[in-house]
Every structure is written in C-alpha cells, then in structure tokens.
Amino acid sequence: MKPTTIALLQKCKQEKKRFATITAYDYSFARLFADEGINVMLVGDSLGMTVQGHDSTLPVTVEDIAYHTRAVRRGAPNCLLLSDLPFMAYATPEQAFENAAVVMRAGANMVKIEGGAWLVDTVKMLTERAVPVCGHLGLTPQSVNIFGGYKIQGRGDAGQVLLDDALALEAAGAQLLVLECVPVELAKRVTEALSIPVIGIGAGNVTDGQILVMHDAFGITGGHIPKFAKNFLAEAGDMRAAVRQYIAEVESSVYPGEEHSFH
C-alpha cells in the first residue's frame, strides 16, 4: 500500500469524500486499524487519560508522545501519522521546533498543536522548516483549566473568533485542522471557509474527516462518556468489524448523527 499523504486528504476534501481517522497508541492497534482501512492516525496526548490514567492530558511529556509514536509507526508504516505536541511543549516557536523534531524523528508525519492566532509565528516557523502542522480549535483539552472543564466552544460571538483563528492558522501554513466540540453550524462555516481539510470530533457530520479516541469507539472509556462518542464494538461484535463499521458510517455521513452533535 502506498503511504497516505496530506495531498490525498486534500483530494478527498475537493471531491467531498469524507474520511475516518482514529487515535492509536501502540503497535497492535495501529496494525489492526491499518489492516481494516484507516490510513490516518493520531498519537494524541489523550493517552494521558486513556493509557496512563491521569484526569487530564497535562502530565503527558514529549518523551511519552515519542515513545507511542514509534510504536504506532511500526504497526502502521504507511499511515499518515499525526502526533500531538503536549502541554507546554510549544510555548515559544523555538521550543516547538525542538520538540517537533523529536516526534518527527520518532515517526510522525505531522505535529498537532492546540490554539488560535497566537500560534501564527509558531506555525510559520515549523512549516518553513519542513514540519507539517495540524491546528486544533474549539475544545482544546490542554486549556481545560482555563475553560473550567470540558465544555462546548464557539457559541455566539466566540464562533467568529474561532473562524478567524482557523483562517489565521491556514494562512500561516497549517495543512490540517481539528475542530472539537463546536456547534454543527460553526463547523460547517469553518469547513467551507478553509481550503485545508477539517477533521471533526463533536462537530457534527459536516467536516471533511472524523476522528474518535479509540477507547470511545470500542466503548471502553472509563467515567464520563462524551455525547459525540459511539460504541461501535457493541453493534459490530468484534474489533475489526467495529473499525469497518466506523469507517463506513463516517464515509456515508451516518456518523456522527444528530444525537452526537451540538447546536
């Protein structure tokens, strides 16, 4: 199989072909996802909660991300692999570049960073130095202490601010954008306004792609279950069939449905 590229996702956007992505943290699941047809994966700092058992993503380190990136890359050598830069790993453009180099050497194709227009200089610095960037707007878990919890973002006047941030990130060179926990109406505006692919989670079925935390897709998340989550394993009966169902429902816009969306 040929390696999946950003250009391929751009083609999907142009042709209005929705694509499914998922988080992965180890060799075995990465191989399973790749075998069943998922070609884009994220080593997310969500591993702090799903793998390490913390109550937020804040304790995750660059070394943690690099470790899991190496494992996922071995399991899915041809996938487009995104890796998060964790909390306080990109406070300055120079720090971002140093830490991006670590995860890129570990096997990432692209780094994901959370935040709006304040990241413009960082995005420019990274992309000018051959580090592809995926932005992340809406509910940005590293900002949980600012938000006062995991809450929907972008309602009212905040929606225009988010759209402006998205346009600024694209202009700075970002090649993908993740939108998390925003109203469907705003997600549609952002997706249509940007020329780069937009990947949603809790943003309705109007984005170019969809991502889920693998533990949510398999119904093994402890504690609070997000509204946008769906247990595909319960319906499909086994993990491989669950992954295939997830892909099929994303591509056909069945998932996420109205019951998984915000307004």
UniProtKB/Swiss-Prot annotation:
Principal EC category: transferase
Gene3D superfamilies: Phosphoenolpyruvate-binding domains
Catalytic activity, reaction form: 3-methyl-2-oxobutanoate + (6R)-5,10-methylene-5,6,7,8-tetrahydrofolate + H2O = 2-dehydropantoate + (6S)-5,6,7,8-tetrahydrofolate
Molecular function via GO: 3-methyl-2-oxobutanoate hydroxymethyltransferase activity; magnesium ion binding
InterPro entries: Pantoate_hydroxy_MeTrfase, Pyrv/PenolPyrv_kinase-like_dom, Pyrv_kinase-like_dom_sf
Pathway info: Cofactor biosynthesis; (R)-pantothenate biosynthesis; (R)-pantoate from 3-methyl-2-oxobutanoate: step 1/2
Binding site for Mg(2+): 45, 84, 114
Main location: cytoplasm
Protein EC: 2.1.2.11
CDD domains: KPHMT-like
Highest taxon of the lineage: Bacteria
Active-site residues, record numbering mapped to chain: 180 (proton acceptor)
Localization per Swiss-Prot or TrEMBL: Cytoplasm
GO biological process assignments: pantothenate biosynthetic process
Cofactor(s), by name: Mg(2+)
Gene Ontology annotations for the cellular component aspect, listed alphabetically: cytoplasm
Binding residues for 3-methyl-2-oxobutanoate: 45-46, 84, 112
Family: Belongs to the PanB family.
Function: Catalyzes the reversible reaction in which hydroxymethyl group from 5,10-methylenetetrahydrofolate is transferred onto alpha-ketoisovalerate to form ketopantoate.
Official protein name in the record: 3-methyl-2-oxobutanoate hydroxymethyltransferase
Lineage: Bacteria, Pseudomonadati, Pseudomonadota, Gammaproteobacteria, Enterobacterales
Gene for this chain: panB
